[in-house]
Amino acid sequence: MVLIKEFRVVLPCSVQEYQVGQLYSVAEASKNETGGGEGIEVLKNEPYEKDGEKGQYTHKIYHLKSKVPAFVRMIAPEGSLVFHEKAWNAYPYCRTIVTNEYMKDDFFIKIETWHKPDLGTLENVHGLDPNTWKTVEIVHIDIADRSQVEPADYKADEDPALFQSVKTKRGPLGPNWKKELANSPDCPQMCAYKLVTIKFKWWGLQSKVENFIQKQEKRIFTNFHRQLFCWIDKWIDLTMEDIRRMEDETQKELETMRKRGSVRGTSAADV
């Protein structure tokens, strides 16, 4: 049995713009989560081609300890809180799988994303069979809705309801921004449809951990896309060549940061 949710994130940018914005923001957010022996280690970042699909393959290791809830830390053996993330980015479709060597086949997180030029109105964009699709909970994330943000995560300079882009003049996003976007032919629009499938097979803990992970994924998607929009002036003029160069630099920075300093970034809100 697995727990499946589809998160829909509407943004006032084009699918083409988002490709650069997403990669820029991933690199920046990785730095904010790395330090003191924890965080993100990039093993591979290279082009791939398989079965007619072309894109960028990444393999990252997440060193987590303080970033999981206390009830998991209590039962997790030393060294088991290391997770492997493999991602195939054949934009506008992306697939990410997170595994753990200690739990082997009893655990995975799979995130499949389609980026579409609409306002999140497409149904079953991932083409699931009807019986599976009936079990999927759809969650709409509004990047301008402060009530969807954990109080500890809130930053005024990463609030789309307050931010206005100098370069694009987009923002601030009011309470009815999605309706306004639908009626504004001049402003681009898109939706990230993120299908998250979670398996955690551990007697007595399965539903608690699966629900915790889904809650954390929503938190990550919400914070990440708020940042992405508020950082638009930093990435809107970048090319994919700029991004690849930045990723190489970030990979080296992360290695240094992880080995030094104190633990940084998001910690687990216990459930």
Swiss-Prot record:
The modification N6-acetyllysine is found at K215. The modification Phosphoserine is found at S262. It is found in: Golgi apparatus; Golgi apparatus membrane; Endoplasmic reticulum membrane. CDD domains: SRPBCC_PITPNA-B_like (cd08888). Widely expressed in various tissues including brain. Pfam families: IP_trans (PF02121). GO terms for molecular function: phosphatidylcholine binding; phosphatidylcholine transfer activity; phosphatidylcholine transporter activity; phosphatidylinositol binding; phosphatidylinositol transfer activity; sphingomyelin transfer activity. Its main location: Golgi. PANTHER family: PHOSPHATIDYLINOSITOL TRANSFER PROTEIN, PHOSPHATIDYLINOSITOL TRANSFER PROTEIN BETA ISOFORM. Belongs to the PtdIns transfer protein family. PI transfer class I subfamily. This is Phosphatidylinositol transfer protein beta isoform. It comes from Homo sapiens. The gene is PITPNB.
